[in-house]
């Protein structure tokens, strides 16, 4: 591919966000957007710099990231494990899946009052909510991926004399990976959404806490900064997942085509 075309393709997704930021800055400079409603990007960048210098932004960012990753690991591991179990075992699916589907239909954020009763307002409550939020996307997509592996490939593996372990590692798991990665990308979005809400539950640290404290003092620039940080974290998490997709699914013709197109 032409290097100039390649550079343009990489820059293309950023044109609309850049245009919106420029429009936002111009509108603020002309007085069309009052600072108390939506501060200018330059004001948000200034407060970000100030918060970085005093250490509060890196500290809160680190706390939020640790909470998000802890919830993702806990909820993701359980969801992945149960997805495999129910996908590989008809008995497991009949025994567990109906109950899990009933729980799935209850919005996990609606459980906040009950979670506070169970865990109080400490870290356990926030981790539980994040873990529950990421559990179902990963569980459902793992189950779907395992169930939709081509039966002919499984049969061929058996004909070649693969034992159950080899069949799982060489055929079933690779065949389920595209669906699992879809679940991971969806789970990451739910993870940050849940964390925003969870950090408003009497938290004393984290980006959500920083936003809530700023709201009390009508510091709109800090609130906007917090929202932008969540958006950036979400984008970075999604990009990391796409990178892993390209790495682990290079054998898949669909992903090979996408990679070649770039």
Q: Where are these predicted regions, by residue range?
A:
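N-terminal signal-anchor/first transmembrane alpha helix
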Residues: 1-28
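Periplasmic/extracellular loop-to-transmembrane helix junction in inner-membrane transport proteins
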Residues: 2-4, 30-73
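Transmembrane-helix boundary motif in ABC transporter permease subunits
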Residues: 70-100
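C-terminal transmembrane helix and the adjacent membrane-cytosol boundary/short C-terminal tail
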Residues: 90, 147, 178, 182, ...
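Short cytoplasmic-facing helical segments at TM-TM junctions of multi-pass membrane proteins
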Residues: 98, 141, 145-183, 211
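Generic hydrophobic transmembrane alpha-helix motif, especially the helices
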Residues: 101-137, 144-145
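Glycine-rich helix-loop "coupling/hinge" segments at transmembrane-helix boundaries
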Residues: 116-117, 146, 193-230, 249-259
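Transmembrane alpha-helices
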Residues: 128, 132, 164-197, 221, ...
């Amino acid at each position: 591919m032409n290097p100039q075309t390649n550079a343009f393709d990489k820059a293309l997704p950023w044109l609309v966000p850049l245009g919106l930021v420029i429009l936002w800055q111009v509108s603020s400079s002309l007085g069309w957007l009052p600072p108390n409603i939506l501060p200018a990007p330059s004001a948000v960048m200034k407060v970000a710099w100030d918060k970085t210098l005093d250490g509060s932004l890196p500290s809160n960012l680190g706390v939020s990231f640790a909470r998000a990753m802890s919830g993702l690991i806990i909820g993701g591991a359980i969801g992945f494990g149960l997805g495999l179990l129910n996908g590989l075992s008809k008995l497991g699916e009949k025994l567990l899946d109906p109950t899990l589907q009933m729980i799935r239909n209850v919005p996990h954020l609606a459980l906040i009052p009950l979670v506070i009763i169970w865990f109080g307002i400490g870290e356990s409550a926030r981790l539980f909510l994040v873990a529950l939020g990421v559990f179902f996307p990963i569980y459902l997509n793992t189950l779907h991926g395992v169930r939709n592996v081509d039966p002919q490939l499984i049969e061929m593996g058996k004909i070649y004399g693969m034992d159950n372990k080899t069949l799982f590692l060489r055929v079933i798991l690779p065949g389920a990976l595209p669906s699992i990665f879809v679940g991971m990308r969806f789970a990451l979005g739910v993870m940050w959404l849940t964390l925003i809400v969870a950090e408003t539950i009497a938290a004393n640290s984290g980006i959500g806490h920083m936003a809530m404290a700023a709201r009390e003092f009508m510091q709109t620039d800090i609130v906007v900064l917090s929202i932008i940080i969540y958006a950036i974290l979400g984008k970075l998490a999604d990009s990391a997942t796409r990178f892993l997709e390209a790495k682990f699914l290079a054998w898949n013709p669909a992903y090979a085509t996408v990679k070649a197109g770039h």
